């Protein structure tokens, strides 16, 4: 077994033990247990509003990453969970494939249309979000930099050491953000842009909401984030948020555990979220989301809600679900695991371009090449390899060798620049 797989196995065992401990108390008939990928801050207002309803029961939440919840819900602990609240269709697909979700009939069309076709029998969409760039204006001013407003602007060499991201393997929010970029720009151009941006990263955060918190703390200057984490922080005058011009939508899904002993109360909670009152709660700035139903006429957020909902840049979620493991591992191999080397290579390139006062496209091409072609990326025969551990490991090794060789060639070419 490789060292990477040993570390991954050990981490999963530790996480599973911690999660089991968090559910050690037996589920109670007078409470709902919600497993969610959202932060406590993102769900606090929703839960508070629900508990003011007549006959409402107390809610207990388990806030974890999608990967951690996937491991948790594959154990007998699932029997203590009533609802799953997440923006991750990947998590819901995993639960559905393992027969972990109850059916949800008779949902309104405004909810159903935002749910991927294969999940429509088991999940409701109650709200949605968009993607943009969160900026610490103080950090920008200190460096005399413009506020970035698009993916392309994040490739500017002046942002070296100021950008933050998470990775698709650590955050399904970032997985969907990355997939949105790859599908809109095309496989090759999308990866070239991501690799270019990686040269400006300060670090890769382990949690998506951790990225927004780090920007607020001034540990970074700008980051692509989902809007609900940004809106929760925008009371700070030092922060600004702008939607990406080609932002896709990211629905908030709710599903009921097949093993829930409180299904009637769980359904009542979903009915509340889809009611007029519940939609108003979800539209409140303290949740940072947009409701699936229209906002009142004159509400300043309605034009943005409508633009995001009707964006032509929506994702092929079936493709996202099919090639999930491949994209996650490719991002980590290309960027996460070699971030230091990537930063050094791009810094050397920027220095060389500044010295000769012209771009060096042949070296940029070396630093942005990928070991997986656009054709392979959409080929089931290729991405299905990652369902087989042995075949997947062979690909990871090939990718590592590819990036090492590209780096070697780039350095050799930089040494020739005069």
Explain the meaning of each model-derived region.
Residues 44, 80, 87-205, 210-219:
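Extracytoplasmic ligand-binding site segments that recognize negatively charged/polar headgroups
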């Amino acid at each position: 077994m490789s060292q990477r797989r040993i570390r991954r196995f050990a981490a999963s065992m530790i996480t599973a033990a911690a999660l089991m401990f968090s559910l050690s108390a037996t589920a109670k008939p007078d409470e709902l247990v919600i497993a969610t990928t959202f932060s406590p801050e993102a769900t606090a207002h929703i839960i508070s509003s629900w508990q003011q309803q007549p006959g409402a029961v107390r809610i207990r939440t388990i806030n974890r990453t999608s990967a951690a919840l996937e491991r948790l819900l594959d154990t007998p602990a699932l029997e203590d969970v009533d609802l799953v609240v997440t923006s991750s269709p990947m998590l819901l697909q995993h639960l559905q494939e393992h027969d972990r979700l109850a059916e949800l009939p008779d949902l309104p069309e405004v909810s159903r249309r935002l749910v991927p076709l294969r999940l429509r029998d088991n999940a409701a969409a109650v709200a949605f979000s968009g993607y943009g760039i969160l900026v610490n204006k103080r950090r920008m001013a200190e460096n005399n930099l413009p506020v970035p407003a698009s993916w392309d602007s994040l490739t500017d060499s002046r942002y070296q050491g100021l950008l933050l991201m998470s990775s698709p393997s650590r955050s399904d929010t970032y997985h969907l953000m990355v997939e949105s970029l790859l599908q809109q720009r095309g496989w090759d151009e999308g990866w070239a842009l991501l690799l270019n941006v990686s040269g400006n990263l300060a670090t890769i955060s382990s949690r998506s909401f951790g990225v927004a918190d780090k920007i607020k703390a001034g540990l970074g200057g700008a980051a692509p984030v989902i809007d609900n984490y940004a809106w929760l922080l925008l009371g700070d005058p030092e922060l600004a948020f702008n939607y990406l011009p080609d932002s896709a939508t990211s629905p908030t899904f709710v599903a009921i555990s097949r093993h829930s002993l409180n299904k009637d109360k769980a359904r009542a909670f979903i009915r509340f979220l889809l009611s007029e009152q519940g939609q108003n709660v979800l539209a409140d700035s303290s949740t940072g989301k947009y409701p699936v139903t229209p906002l009142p006429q004159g509400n300043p957020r309605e034009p943005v809600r409508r633009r995001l909902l009707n964006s032509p840049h929506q994702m092929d979620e079936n493709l996202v679900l099919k090639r999930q493991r491949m994209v996650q591992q490719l991002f980590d191999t290309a960027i996460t695991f070699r971030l230091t080397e990537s930063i050094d290579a791009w810094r050397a390139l920027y220095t060389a371009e500044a010295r000769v006062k012209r771009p060096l496209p042949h070296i940029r091409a070396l630093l942005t090449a990928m070991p997986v072609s656009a054709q392979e990326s959409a080929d089931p025969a290729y991405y299905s390899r990652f369902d087989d551990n042995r075949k997947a490991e062979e690909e990871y090794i090939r990718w590592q060798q590819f990036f090492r060789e590209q780096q070697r060639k780039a350095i050799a070419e930089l040494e020739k620049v005069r």
